[in-house]
A protein has these predicted regions:
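Primarily membrane-embedded glycan-assembly and transfer machineries that use lipid-linked glycans
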Residues: 1-220, 224-226, 248-377, 447-453, ...
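Aromatic-enriched
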Residues: 2, 72, 391-494
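Hydrophobic cores of alpha-helical transmembrane segments in multi-pass inner/ER membrane proteins
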Residues: 8-18, 335, 384-389, 456-473
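A cytosolic-side transmembrane-helix exit/cap motif
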Residues: 227-231, 278-284, 401-407
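Central hydrophobic cores of alpha-helical transmembrane segments
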Residues: 231, 260-266, 361-366, 406-418
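Transmembrane helices and adjacent periplasmic/lumenal helix-loop junctions
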Residues: 231-248, 372-379
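Membrane-embedded alpha-helical segments of transport systems
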Residues: 236-238, 266-270, 419-423
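Hydrophobic/aromatic-rich transmembrane helices and adjacent perimembrane loops
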Residues: 376-393
Length: 494
């Protein structure tokens, strides 16, 4: 809860002043002057409702308090993380792996890694093995030069810089110079739970998300060398980045793919050399480590509530029938991939199989990366492009289209699903509720497991479907706009 003491009062005041100063439409105000969307009776009623003094005050107060609470929480989190022995749980794996690499020992060997983990971190017992690919070793090599606490501090600073790059990249992709929309974009991206959670545990998901985001920015400008290097580096966590290699192959951006493959291959062999490993030995150790890693309760689809991917939906619904559970998850994923493939075919056929890349495609591939592969809470940072897409879609509707209740319902479904992945709902509400049970011991009631605690997984599915529907609808709208002299389009065919 927010403490309304002296310092918190100052923070609340500063946040309110900053938001007020930036809550301006600027160029958008003139662009919206003749908007058919805003002239709709439904929108006019909403505008009148929110213009009521009490409603306007409550909305503004709510935004100020949420932003203030978030800033206070993040500030205290950063402070505690820079103290001796902070709870950066995931970071410890990277640190131990780096230390072993400096000794030319293999972190992929289960016995060596477990013993070193106990020695370096003083945490012993069952330790999940290091299941990352060897191309991550050169990227975390520098950690081994520092003590544990110094490396902690450096890692936190790197995360803060990465969050800054994520916010910057999101604003680059936003199709508005309005301060109000840029403020909304910045707040919405910052509230994604994965950003805070990644900072809290010291994972690498934020780095991968930033590399993917800037890869798209560079690729859109046909700077394939920079984009390829970003993709090659992002493949240190292949569950989040591997689908983009396939995507660029389908887009025939072969130079970008070639550079990414050269980058990741160089890192792989360098990582193997640093750990005195051969490829066959690595594959043997990785296979054994992966089988042990699957026994971790935080990974099990039947126990874990931290997983976001759709592969846990079936096992949660049918815990006593593994075959049916896996079949259901596979079917959901197959249908989702098929629908995304259909959209891609429509997009390519309308653009003459162009090599140009689109934000909707980036968002859908990002969503699929979370949905079809093993994904934890930190992976929700991959939803940053989804925030920008939904804002850009709203801007497009206001500028060029008439109001459609069906389309706005889909848009609102996407926004509400994205809200589930924020620190407010996923981080504070759902996680706080989970503390009432011993989740790892399997004490969570079935009805809770398939409803409230499954919301993040359902939200990933809903976000993907919503954006897919909006993207297909936009294709039709833009086709009509080509033949509409007044640059207005009706959604009657939607």
């Amino acid at each position: 809860m927010i403490s309304f003491g002296f310092w918190n009062l100052i923070i609340v005041t500063l946040v309110a002043l900053v938001l007020k100063n930036n809550w301006r439409l600027d160029d958008e105000k003139a662009a919206w002057k003749n908007s058919l969307f805003l002239k709709s009776s439904v929108i006019q009623q909403l505008i009148q409702f929110f213009r009521q003094p009490i409603v306007n005050f409550l909305v503004q107060a709510g935004v100020v308090l949420v932003v203030t609470r978030f800033l206070c929480y993040t500030g205290w989190l950063i402070y505690f993380l820079t103290q001796p022995n902070p709870p950066l749980w995931d970071f410890r794996w990277y640190y131990v792996a780096s230390k072993l690499a400096h000794q030319h020992l293999s972190p992929f060997n289960v016995e060596i890694f477990t013993q070193s983990f106990c020695t370096l971190t003083k945490i012993c017992g069952f330790i999940p093995p290091f299941v990352y690919p060897p191309n991550i070793i050169p990227l975390i090599w520098f950690l081994g030069y520092f003590s544990l606490n110094t490396a902690f501090t450096i890692w936190v600073v790197m995360h803060i810089l990465a969050i800054g790059l994520a916010l910057w990249g999101a604003n680059i992709l936003l199709k508005s110079k309005s301060r109000a929309f840029r403020t909304i974009c910045t707040i919405s991206v910052a509230l994604i739970y994965g950003l805070v959670r990644d900072l809290q545990v010291g994972n690498v998901a934020i780095f991968v998300a930033v590399l993917i985001l800037w890869m798209f920015i560079f690729a859109r400008k046909h700077q394939d060398i920079l984009a390829g290097v970003c993709l090659g580096l992002a493949l240190c966590k292949p569950t989040l980045a591997a689908l983009f290699v396939l995507y660029f192959l389908l887009k025939r951006r072969f130079s970008l793919v070639f550079i990414s493959i050269v980058t990741v291959t160089s890192l792989v062999f360098l990582g193997l050399a640093l750990t005195s490993n051969s490829l066959t030995q690595f594959l043997s150790d990785a296979s054994r480590g992966f089988s042990l890693w699957l026994n971790d309760p935080s990974v099990s689809p039947y126990i874990s509530i931290s997983r976001l991917d759709l592969m846990v939906v079936g096992p949660r619904l049918f815990p006593n029938n593994p075959f049916v559970g896996k079949l259901l998850s596979d079917l959901i994923v197959l249908i989702l991939v098929g629908l995304v493939g259909w959209y891609w075919y429509l997009q390519q056929s309308l653009t003459g199989w162009s090599k140009k890349i689109y934000l909707a495609e980036l968002v859908l591939v990002s969503c699929l990366s979370i949905a079809i592969n093993y994904s934890q809470e930190t992976s929700s940072v991959m939803l940053i492009p989804a925030v920008v897409f939904l804002l850009n879609d709203l801007l497009y509707q206001i500028r060029y289209c008439t109001f459609s209740m069906k389309r706005m319902s889909v848009w609102l479904a996407g926004v509400c699903s994205l809200a589930v992945q924020t620190a407010v709902i996923h981080g504070w509400l759902i996680q706080s509720l989970a503390n009432h049970w011993n989740v790892k011991a399997g004490e969570l009631p079935y009805i809770m497991k398939v409803t409230i605690f499954a919301l993040p997984s359902y939200a990933i599915l809903a976000i993907t479907v919503s954006i897919l529907v909006l993207a297909i609808s936009s294709l039709r709208q833009k086709q009509v706009l080509k033949f509409e002299p007044l640059n207005r389009v009706s959604n009657k065919n939607y």
